[in-house]
């Protein structure tokens, strides 16, 4: 997808926001997931070549910042993380609220965030809302749902595998 078109790129931030996610069918505790979420985000720095959003979009990423999502992810309500429902999607209002909640500098540019929606262990799938937004106004430019097959050894790598699969669909 050429989401940005001829638009000036500015700064594109790539990150995982887990503040809205629901998890189905997993044996791990909410606290284990919260720790895994932080470690998954670190992969965007430590394994930047593998998790290269810019390459997929054919655009230069001028900054990778995890500060904003680390702050919102730190405030995840562990009692709300797990669900017994087999489906879950975010409303437009929840998506807009998630973008508005990101504590970012209001500088000109385009931000990108993967908002995790649903991690379904029974189907080995992670579902994500891909959101591009104006970093100055937080106006949403474009958004769509994608998913990826979860795979890998250990909690972090398993769900990071779903992000990697989802990135390939950009």
Where are the predicted features?
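Single conserved hydrophobic/aromatic residue that forms the stacking wall/gate
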Residues: 2-10
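Short, hydrophobic/glycine-enriched beta-strand segments
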Residues: 11-17
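Short secondary-structure boundary/capping segments
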Residues: 12, 27-31, 127-129
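Solvent-exposed loop/turn segments at secondary-structure junctions
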Residues: 18-20, 117-122, 148-151
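N-terminal segment of the mature soluble domain
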Residues: 18-107, 111
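Solvent-exposed, acidic/flexible segments
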Residues: 88, 92, 126, 152-160
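Mature extracytoplasmic/lumenal regions of exported proteins
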Residues: 94-139, 143
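Short secondary-structure boundary motifs at beta->alpha junctions and helix caps
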Residues: 136-170
């Amino acid at each position: 997808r050429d989401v940005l078109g001829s638009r000036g790129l500015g700064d594109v931030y790539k990150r995982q926001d887990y503040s809205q996610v629901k998890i189905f069918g997993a044996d791990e505790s909410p606290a284990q997931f919260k720790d895994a979420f932080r470690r998954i985000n670190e992969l965007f720095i430590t394994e930047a070549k593998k998790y290269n959003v810019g390459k997929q979009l054919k655009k230069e990423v001028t900054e990778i910042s995890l500060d904003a999502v680390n702050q919102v992810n730190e405030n995840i309500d562990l009692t709300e993380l797990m669900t017994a429902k087999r489906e879950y999607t975010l409303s437009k209002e929840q998506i807009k609220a998630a973008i508005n909640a990101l504590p970012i500098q209001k500088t000109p540019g385009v931000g990108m965030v993967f908002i995790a929606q649903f991690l379904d262990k029974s189907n080995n799938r992670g579902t994500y809302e891909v959101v591009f937004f104006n970093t100055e106004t937080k106006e949403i430019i474009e958004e769509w749902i994608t998913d990826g097959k979860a795979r890998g050894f250990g909690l972090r790598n398993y769900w990071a595998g779903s992000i990697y699969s989802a990135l390939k669909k950009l």
